[in-house]
Structure formats: C-alpha cells, structure tokens
C-alpha cells in the first residue's frame, strides 16, 4: 500500500485473518480481525454475549497452537442460559458487523445496572484521545479501534 504522508511511502497493509472461538466445546464464532490482543477480544465477546459476567465465570481459556483460535470453558449453567435463548447468529464481515444476533430481544439477559449516558463534549474528547493513541490509525488514516473508558479518561486502548 502506498499512502504515506508524502504520497509515496510504502505502508504495510493491516492484516485481517480468521480467528475462531469454541465455548464449552462448541463452535461459537469466527471473526475476521487483526490478530492483536486476541485474548481481550475473546474475553470481551464472551462478556458481551452473556457467557461470563465476572472474571470467575471464565473457567479456562486456551489458545490453539496451530492456528488462530481459542477454547473457552464457562460454567455450564451460564452456557445453557445463553444457548437456550431464541437467537440465530449471522456471521458478517465488514465495518460495524461481525456477529448479529436475531431473535427474541426479551430473552436477552439484562445487566443489573444501567450505564450512565456520557456527556457529548466528553465523548468527543474521548474519541479524539482514542484516535491519537492509534499508531496504525496515524499511519494509514483509518483502522478499527476500541477503548475502555470510565467516562472521564481512556483506561485501555486496542
């Protein structure tokens, strides 16, 4: 890829490869993603899907030695609850859609607390901080990124 600041500097293209996950021995998802910070991706996805609520719910997480994939074990009751919901996973690739869940929304478990809605000005500040930290974003002009915030500052960046 040629797109450096001078218009001629060669830049490395961002890798995007398949990464699979099995939960309790069953295939759960395959992502197309940059192969960085995959352990954080796995934990975050398991949390977002409801397989884990706390650190102790992640009984084990093993990476595959031969290819990009992980085996995760969670408590059987949590696994059964998620799998028993009326959901149909649709794997999609591209910006904004990796896994889309179709099904009965009333069956999706709700969090115990409702997060606060951040201030718009503070949200803009946090997004600017997110993009400022992205080395690949700076060199390519665009790449997927994520951050964890407490609403005041960025706590972690990927």
Task: Pin down the residues of each PLM region.
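Intrinsically disordered, low-complexity regions enriched in acidic/Ser/Thr/Pro/Gln residues
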Residues: 1-151, 156-157
